[in-house]
Design a protein with these regions (language model features):
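A short helix->loop->beta-strand "cap" motif at the edges of active sites that frequently abuts
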Residues: 147-152
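Surface-exposed amphipathic alpha-helices with a cationic face
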Residues: 140-144
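Short, small-residue-biased leader/transition segments that mark boundaries at the very start
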Residues: 2-7
Length: 234
């Protein structure tokens, strides 16, 4: 009898979630991001995004600026925005629609899928993550209430940056982002959302943004290779 059989016999796992129980001699710890993240589920064509919305900061703005084909998905990208602005219903500027309140735009559209990417513009300094994560949790609650249970909410990990960019913005250093993303994964699971690990597509072996897909500033993505890699991953 293999160790796996003994394990299965002695430990009974409950329903899927971010935490696990203690049973017998085994302590089942909380899942980490590598387990929580959504695995590949087969390729879909771009029409999959026709009933989707994308909510985020300047990285999401790039979908509009570079006219990335997402089959008419609603792009709610706002430069410099963080989850606090969404929760507090701040007036934010869309490059295509002007001033608006993101929650109102999403409430009117009622997308079936929502892809969130926030953090790159708000985690540039060390010590900002606690406030960021607290607001992120509140934001997910607000979005669920606004969009209902039928909307699939995808929480995307904060992408890595190039080493030179991390030196200027220590809050975006690889080890810092790994820690924040780990907490984002746990938060997503606890709120019934799907966690997507963009590092699978965007990070090199050292945990930095791949040079070939980086914009000159080392933080944003290049129009062709960068956004192509992102969309292909999604």
């Amino acid at each position: 009898r293999g160790l796996g059989d003994v394990y299965k016999r002695q430990v009974q796992l409950e329903s899927f979630g971010p935490a696990r129980q203690t049973d017998g001699a085994y302590t089942i710890k909380a899942y980490d991001a590598s387990v929580i993240r959504q695995p590949a589920c087969g390729q879909v064509d771009l029409s999959y995004f026709s009933d989707a919305a994308f909510l985020g900061d300047s990285l999401t703005v790039g979908f509009s600026d570079y006219q990335i084909n997402l089959s008419g998905a609603l792009i709610c990208g706002y430069t410099g925005v963080g989850p606090d602005a969404i929760v507090n219903r701040a007036a934010v500027k869309s490059p295509t629609r002007g001033q608006e309140v993101a929650l109102d735009v999403l409430a009117a559209a009622q997308p079936k899928k929502l892809y969130i990417l926030l953090g790159t513009n708000t985690l540039t300094t060390l010590g900002a993550s606690d406030r960021f994560l607290a607001y992120y949790g509140q934001m997910l609650d607000e979005l669920r209430q606004t969009l209902g249970e039928d909307c699939i909410i995808y929480v995307q990990s904060i992408p890595p940056v190039r080493p030179a960019a991390a030196e200027k913005k220590p809050g975006l250093a690889s080890d810092v982002l790994r820690g924040v993303n780990e907490q984002l994964a746990q938060l997503a699971a606890s709120k019934g959302c799907v966690y997507l690990d963009l590092w699978e597509a965007l990070a090199d072996g050292e945990g930095n943004l791949k040079e070939m897909i980086a914009a000159p500033d080392g933080v944003h993505l290049s129009a062709g290779n960068g956004y192509g890699a992102w969309v292909t991953y999604l």
